Amino acid sequence: MPLSKLTLFYVRTLALGALLCSSFVAQAKQVDVHDPVMTREGDTWYLFSTGPGITIYSSTDRVNWKYSDRAFATEPTWAKSVSPKFDGHLWAPDIIQHNNQFYLYYSVSAFGKNTSAIGLTVNKTLNPKSPDYRWEDKGIVIESVPNRDAWNAIDPAVIVDEQGAAWMSFGSFWSGLKIFKLNSDWTRPAEPQEWHSIAKRDQVPTGTHSSAGPGEIEAPFILKKGDYYYLFASWGLCCKGANSTYHLVVGRAKNVTGPYVDRAGKDMNEGGGSLLIKGNKKWVGLGHNSAYSWDGKDYLVLHAYETADNYLQKLKILNIHWDQEGWPLVDEKELDSYQSRRQK
């Protein structure tokens, strides 16, 4: 039976709608972030990224994201006194709840220098529409000084141990990754101070504390799972487009301060670290992760550079699975299957 004009109208309308829909999906932009961390308030997720003032996005499903705010409208007042070459970009945040507030740690530095400091700003809520929304900067938590310190005060991540004490891991290049106990209000190191080295690669030669050295390791993040603390770290180089060699390794320990060992039993302080994920031709420069347990499942949050988009950094959230020996596994195929969408 021949189609009526009305039927033809509906067919053409549906076809046009499908075409427009597919075009929208194809053109939907992914969220471009670096060094992502996340938290949740109510039914909303908040994502924090390196950028001017620390970029914040919000989502109710961890796929569709809207720009929310920046934690700083202008740079911290003390930033240039610590790092004269600071360019306004706050690096490598960490977000955690404490005392009914959200604690946002961040890094002030200049590329390749350890003229660096980790700062803290706090807020009662992450909802920018709330009358209680206001970031209050608490200043410097720790600072590294060239020719004094053989470490770099960037890339903070806070973990609470089984006794309720808060510890901050941090570090990039130089003599590797460190961890120290925070005081009761999480604003400074606890006294007397307790510091530990948790991972390093090549040693920095004596007398060259102003140089990063060859030890390509940074961005520690610790996740407690079962009987172990799992230390994730980024090896290699970021921020070099097609030449980026960033990839993720992991070790574990029974104590938050270590020693962290890899699958072969090698101490991460002696260069140990088991490969977790390296990427492929489509996705390079994988790294600077965080890791979380949400609603009974475990997730790895990281950035990856997309080759097809001129190596622009994209948000990736991957499922963490665990093998019979209790080691984390992630599926490289999820780099393709997880596609964030930035909403207007």
Name each region found by the language model.
Residues 2-14:
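Bacterial N-terminal signal peptides that target proteins for export
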Residues 5, 23-24:
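Compositionally biased regions
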Residues 12-23:
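Bacterial N-terminal signal peptides
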Residues 26-344:
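Carbohydrate-active catalytic/glycan-binding domains of CAZyme proteins
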